[in-house]
């Protein structure tokens, strides 16, 4: 892969900022922003030449990055250019490396990062929605995810199972997106007073007779393991969150599955 020089002064070049969401940029800011996005997009094209041979190819998950005038999105999760974590994330992209944040989510399969240039447009939606990408882009390399995304439209199946969570209409309700280890997405309503353990119970009931190894839960982008299952969704700040099922491979499960 072609080596790419690091930015000499990332804070000086990272000028795609707005005083508040969706405010227009000044002429100087817009010019510098366009230069930065052009530079980043050009480097993404350069490093896209590295390919994986058919013998080495693994199952793939796509991550869609769009570079807007007022920030950038990762699978429609909006981020500011001025944030320190965002700067580190985009530095990795510019060097053709998979950001450590994505490495923490995907550790079994190949990640295909798509970079789209939308510097002349303002991103109006900042609602985080984790969804697959379909279309052309620039591959930055490979890594290993547990999630297998598909470019096809994903529809919610087994709707009868989705009614397993009792809701209190007198309390706030939130939508939780759940990505199962097999790549299937579920959207389920919960009260914010439900606990993390209720999400885990729901997944077990949803999968029903389909035997699966023990699993844990984590949020996506940024990665956060949900270790305390007694927390409510409000306490864990999981309103409208994206939850990932992460399988735990154990010998005891293999023994059980043989019976």
Swiss-Prot record:
Gene Ontology molecular-function annotations: acetylcholine receptor binding; ubiquitin binding
Glycosyltransferase in keyword set: no
Xref: Pfam families: SEP (PF08059), UBX (PF00789)
Which PROSITE patterns does the UniProt entry name for this protein?
SEP, UBX
The chain positions of domain UBX read: 169-246
Ranges where the record places region Required for interaction with CHRNA3: 1-151
Tell me the compartments it is located in.
Golgi apparatus; Endoplasmic reticulum; Perikaryon; Cell projection, Dendrite
Task: Check the record and name the Gene3D superfamilies matching this protein.
Answer: Phosphatidylinositol 3-kinase Catalytic Subunit, Chain A, domain 1, SEP domain
Q: Quote the PTM field.
A: Ubiquitinated.
Where's it mainly located? Golgi
Keyword Nucleus present in the record's keywords: the answer is: yes
Q: Which residues form the SEP domain?
A: 60-124
Annotated tissue distribution: Expressed in the colon (at protein level).
Listed A to Z, the keywords are:
Cell projection, Cytoplasm, Endoplasmic reticulum, Golgi apparatus, Nucleus, Ubl conjugation
Q: What are its GO biological-process terms?
A: autophagosome assembly; cellular response to leukemia inhibitory factor; Golgi organization; membrane fusion; negative regulation of ERAD pathway; negative regulation of proteolysis; nuclear membrane reassembly; positive regulation of protein catabolic process
| Region feature (Required for interaction with VCP) | 167-259
Q: Which domain of life is it from?
A: Eukaryota
* Positions of region (Required for inhibition of CHRNA3 ubiquitination and translocation of CHRNA3 to the plasma membrane resulting in an increase in acetylcholine-gated nicotinic acetylcholine receptor currents): 1-164
Can you supply one Gene Ontology CC term for this chain's record? dendrite
Any idea what job this protein has? Acts to repress the ubiquitination and subsequent endoplasmic reticulum-associated degradation of CHRNA3 by the STUB1-VCP-UBXN2A complex in cortical neurons. Also acts to promote the translocation of CHRNA3 to the plasma membrane and subsequently increases plasma membrane acetylcholine-gated ion-channel activation. Plays a role in the inhibition of STUB1-mediated TP53 degradation, via its interaction with HSPA9 which acts to inhibit TP53 binding to HSPA9. Positively mediates the ubiquitination and proteosomal degradation of RICTOR, may thereby act as a negative regulator of the mTORC2 pathway.
Subunit field text:
Part of a complex composed of STUB1/CHIP, VCP/p97, CHRNA3, and UBXN2A that modulates the ubiquitination and endoplasmic reticulum-associated degradation (ERAD) of CHRNA3. Within the complex UBXN2A acts as a scaffold protein required for the interaction of CHRNA3 with VCP/p97, this interaction also inhibits CHRNA3 ubiquitination by STUB1/CHIP and subsequently ERAD. Interacts (via SEP domain) with CHRNA3 and interacts (via UBX domain) with VCP/P97; these interactions are required for the interaction of CHRNA3 with the STUB1-VCP-UBXN2A complex.
Miscellaneous section: Acts as a tumor suppressor in cancer cells via stabilization of TP53 and subsequent promotion of TP53-mediated apoptosis. Acts as a tumor suppressor in colorectal cancer by repressing cell migration, growth, tumor dedifferentiation and cancer stem cell populations. May act as a biomarker of positive survival outcome in both colon and rectal adenocarcinoma patients.
Q: What is this protein called?
A: UBX domain-containing protein 2A
What species is this protein from? Homo sapiens
């Amino acid at each position: 892969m072609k080596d790419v020089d690091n930015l000499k002064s990332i804070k000086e070049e990272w000028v795609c900022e707005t005083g508040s969401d969706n405010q227009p940029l000044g002429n100087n800011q817009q010019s510098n922003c366009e230069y930065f996005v052009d530079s980043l997009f050009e480097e993404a094209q350069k490093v896209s030449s590295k390919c994986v041979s058919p013998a080495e190819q693994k199952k793939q998950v796509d991550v869609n990055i769009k570079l807007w005038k007022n920030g950038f999105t990762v699978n429609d999760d909006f981020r500011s250019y001025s944030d320190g974590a965002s700067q580190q994330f985009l530095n990795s992209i510019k060097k053709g490396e998979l950001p450590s944040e994505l490495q923490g989510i995907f550790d079994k399969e190949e990640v295909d990062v798509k970079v789209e240039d939308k510097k002349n447009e303002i991103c109006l939606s900042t609602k985080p929605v984790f969804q697959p990408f379909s279309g052309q882009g620039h591959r930055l390399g490979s890594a290993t995810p547990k999630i297998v995304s598909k470019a096809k439209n994903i529809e919610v199946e087994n709707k009868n199972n989705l009614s397993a969570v009792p809701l209190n209409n007198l309390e706030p309700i939130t939508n939780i997106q759940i990505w199962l280890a097999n790549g299937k997405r579920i959207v389920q309503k919960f009260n914010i007073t439900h606990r993390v353990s209720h999400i885990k119970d729901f997944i077990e009931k949803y999968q029903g007779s389909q035997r699966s190894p023990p699993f844990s839960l984590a949020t996506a982008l940024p990665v956060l393991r949900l270790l305390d299952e007694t927390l409510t969704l409000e306490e864990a700040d999981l309103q409208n969150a994206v939850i990932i099922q992460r399988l735990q491979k154990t010998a005891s499960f293999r023994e059980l599955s043989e019976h």
